[in-house]
Structure formats: C-alpha cells, structure tokens
C-alpha cells in the first residue's frame, strides 16, 4: 500500500509519469537504457523505474527466489534501492520516480503482507528518502540503496564499533556483503577493526521449495 500510495502521488504530481506492465511496450526498448544518462553527460535523462520482487518467497523455489542486488548493483549507471518497511517503500519509490537515472527497486515479496506503522512525516505527499543514504538504528545500518552505496556511513559505524557484520539474502560469492567488506578493507576504517569482518548470507545453492 505504501508503494501504491507513493506511485499515486507521483502520477498526480507529474503528468509525464506513467506506468507500463510486462510485455506491453515495444520489444528491446529498455535495453542499454542504464548508460544513456551517464554517456550523454547528463543531457539525456532516463527517468525510468523498474520494480520487481526480490529474494526468497514462499512456494516459488529456485526458479523465482534469486536475490538480484549484486547483479543490478554491478551495472554502472543504474541506481538500486531495496526498501525494508513502509516508510522506506514510499519514500524510495517517490525519489526513484523523480530521479533522472534509471532506478531498480528490489522489493522483498515476503514483506508485501507485513503491516508497518507509517510515521506521520511519511504520510505527507512531500515525503522523500534520498537515494544513496542509509537508515541507522542502534548501529544496524538499513542500507536501503545498493548503488550508490553510502559507504561513509558504514565506515563511520566501523570506526565507532570496531566490528562489521554484513547480512543479505543473496548468495555469498561476489555479493553485496563482499563488496562492503572490500571497501572497508581498502578504506580508512580497516585499521579500526578488532576482528575480521563476518558475512551472513544465503546458502550457496539454488533456493529449495518451501511453503
């Protein structure tokens, strides 16, 4: 409902905003779209948002349970966001629609049916969550945006706590957690670690079927 509310408000705000569904547009139209804005030095904006379920879900097994965060986050020119709660979902979908770059919004299908309290601030039509900024609660960093990644916030947390644990639903090899660990190793926060960084990931196997 938060995603729908965000889209409804943006459709009402800007007459140029519209929706397209699967296989209703001309074939091949979306290919290579991610580089257009960058390659034109910002002269040709590509304000398009791709929404879709991401990660494990009940009863869909290996065919439909992949985590695409690392896949899309690997592509220069794309912005990748991943909301956790209703506040994230509404604020990020509105920011994504207003962005001049193509944005991929990865939505956890298990969260669609979960009720979250929506703060009064988030109920405003002007509510936005900036892409590229994390959410922090008790040193738990809700990354929200996969690309661009707010590495400065992660570094600040490591320098404060002297520890790093990454948690993701995707596979361990070449994942988002691996990227975070690599950036910490390459940056100023590495010398603040009191212990090796730890990654918590999905198992390195296709997702089994379960209801």
Swiss-Prot record:
Repressor listed as a keyword: no
Chief location of this protein within or outside the cell: mitochondrion
Site, as annotated: Important for interaction with DLAT: 194
Pfam families: Transket_pyr, Transketolase_C
SUPFAM superfamilies: Thiamin diphosphate-binding fold (THDP-binding) (SSF52518), TK C-terminal domain-like (SSF52922)
Catalytic activity entry: N(6)-[(R)-lipoyl]-L-lysyl-[protein] + pyruvate + H(+) = N(6)-[(R)-S(8)-acetyldihydrolipoyl]-L-lysyl-[protein] + CO2
Known cofactor(s): thiamine diphosphate
EC number(s) given by UniProt: 1.2.4.1
Gene: PDHB
Its biological purpose: The pyruvate dehydrogenase complex catalyzes the overall conversion of pyruvate to acetyl-CoA and CO(2), and thereby links the glycolytic pathway to the tricarboxylic cycle.
Cross-referenced Gene3D superfamilies: 3.40.50.920, 3.40.50.970
Protein name: Pyruvate dehydrogenase E1 component subunit beta, mitochondrial
Positions of modified residues (Phosphotyrosine): 31
